[in-house]
Amino acid sequence: MNTFLLDTNICVHLLKNEYGIKEKIAKVGTTSCFLSEITMAELLFGIENSAPTRRSENIKRFDNLSLLFSNRILSISNVLHEYAKQKANVRRIGKPVGEFDLLIGATAIVHGLTLVTRNTKDFENLEGIQLENWIAP
């Protein structure tokens, strides 16, 4: 059975009910999908950065997402060695990756999850990562 780590951009589309992400999650099984605590932090930043008129609705959506994934939000504490290895490698080959993307990618690698992202190019230089784009035409 395939298991998946949903990148932040996929969660944003889920929260906005876009691109059939909710249906794709239902198809693979909600329990087969995980989030990184980095994604949660990025979503919280998005809420803090949103217009005051949208903030309460965004908080509700975030809270619902948190409940849905309550026991499937993965910590980064056990992926730090993989993060460091991947960061050194992408620096060595001259293909830098953003810090949060590195942590999310390392989480997918360590847990043996396929990373679902709209931005596959951001992760393609990580060794051993498996990627899927659920939004690609």
Task: Name these PLM-found stretches.
Residues C11, M40-L43, F123:
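A generic structural signal for short hydrophobic patches within well-formed alpha-helices
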Residues D7-N9, D101, N119-D122:
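Acidic active-site catalytic centers that drive phospho-/nucleotidyl reactions
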Residues F45-E48, N71-V116:
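Active-site neighborhoods of divalent-metal-dependent phosphate/nucleic-acid chemistry enzymes
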Residues M1-S36, E48-N64, L68, P137:
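Short, well-structured N-terminal submotif of metal-dependent ribonuclease cores
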Residues K24, E37, E82, D122-N125:
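Residue-level recognition of specific faces of alpha-helices
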Residues G105, I109-P137:
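Acidic, PIN/NYN-like endoribonuclease modules and their adjacent C-terminal/linker elements
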Residues E37-T39, S77, N119, I135:
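Residues at the C-termini of beta-strands that transition into short coil/loop
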